[in-house]
Amino acid sequence: MNLLPQNKESLQMCIGEAKQRDVGKKRARIGPEAMDFLHVAPGEIIQLKGKRLSCAIVWPIDEDEKNPDAVKVDGQTRKNLGVSINDIIEVQKVDTKIAKSVVLMPVTDVVTVDQEFTDFVKNRLKGLPITDGDEISVMILGNSMEFRISKVSPKRIVRIDRSTNLKILSEAVSDKKIRITYEEVGGLVSEIKSMREIVELPLKHPELFSRLGVEPHSGILLYGPPGCGKTLLAKVLATESDANMYSINGPEIMNKYYGETEAKLRDIFKEAKDNSPSIIFIDEIDAIAPKREEVYGDVEKRVVAQLLALMDGLTERGNVVVLGATNRPDSVDPALRRPGRFDREMEISVPNADGRLEILQIHTRGMPLAKDIELKNLASELHGYTGADIKALCREAAIKAIRRYLPEIDLESERIPSKMLQSMEIKLRDFHDSMHEVVPTAMREFYVE
């Protein structure tokens, strides 16, 4: 057993990534040896202690799990704990009581609160373990709404049931930083693994590279068709590595006045260095760094020269990684594509069937799907669809479903009855009809109208 007993009642365990089926459900999957040591059974509650304290419901890992000694939790639980994947936390069994009162605060949106809404949220949270300061997700009409536990009585790990007095505040949390986790990215398993090694590791543990006497990668160029997840991958890397992110959009930063664009670039690189660890993400880099022999204006040539100067020398830039994204890698100036600048290039390609299934699971997570929908079969039909295409397809399928129900809905009434809303579902034919509307990105050049 590779588990590390902390004492007779707790274990030190490594954090692992949750699967799509567990996202937003406060589950922690652990192996049978860990269950035996902690004397817990599936469905019981465990306390998790990282930088902060949280809790989760125990579930068994899959039999074919490659890392049975890890505790698998979703991105929201990792945030509640203040940890990232591969960090070590303390795990122990905990006895919970029923919460007498709980106060929730919406994280991003201002909400209109009435008794019906409060009862709906309370019903969704019934049985879930919570503690003060946690953030939790509630699926409301297909959308995930996040709440922060503002107050809980008694002050310990508790569960919500019918007797709990639940209060929901209408004002949102003011200091919310939007967080995208690895569970929000589908179809890029191998790419995420590689990017974590070359981006997240140097940002979190630069001492590893100092000890070995080598410099980590200073820049990574992501290339591939539009909508495959290049920007999303950059955002999730910044979030999971607790790095500050500075975005530069190629066409937007260009300025016709002499020296303005170069000054903007210098300011962004300086700010990133002052607030390191940082990730600078340059989207559509071919717009600001085209091949100099193919452009006639001095502005583009000066900008390329400035970018080359800024990217030279890791020690001068500090703990900063530069990510560039383009769907035209051959249009980028070759001087940028050499060691010391963008010294690694990674293709973010159109997802395969397994990748499309992952993406479908993400975008249909809150959708009421009919029983005739088998996501694996649907994914096999979506050849050539990128992540953005699948997101658009799911939205279009929902619109098709709404059109089917419109004759039964009284649009003049102030509110649509909750019974009517609960009966709505999306059928397989809605997806098939939507496939005529959403043309896959990878097939557009072959598409005949």
Model-derived segments and spans:
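Beta-strand/loop-dominated core regions that host nucleotide or nucleotide-derived cofactor-binding catalytic loops
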Residues: M1-E183, E197-E200
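AAA+ P-loop ATPase motor domain of ring mechanoenzymes
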Residues: N2-K19, S153-E449
